[in-house]
């Protein structure tokens, strides 16, 4: 879970959201700012540590790209961590998985570490594994991204409603420029790509 900053604060998709917020990222995915920009996309939200979270197509609207996981619930990362712990206990991994970054409090980390030690001991003694500690860890977890994610989706839905033609054969309302539907280029508000 990484702290992010809005790079284009006046973009309509980012209207009335926090200028700094957290977002979970996959540890296996990274498309750099340079790669996004070389593809003609505009980076809207990014993190020094986690990289780009959100970018849009050159028209600023038609295609929206999320590299983070704004859709995650509070316990989504906990479920992924649990999966990795059990992969370790089943011998698929050679060491216990790291905690999800910036997600577990110090206390939650100690609880998780203690569980791994107890599970390792149970395996050595040929006993059943103890139940994973979701009930104990869950209340210690914070969701620091959900409200912002909902606001972005709501902004997008509002723009779709405002711009889309009622005639399903036509993409936009009459008078909407398909290359600049948000009029960002016309207003000089479009960041250079």
Say what each PLM segment does.
Residues 5-193:
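Amide-donor transfer/coupling interface in amidating biosynthetic enzymes
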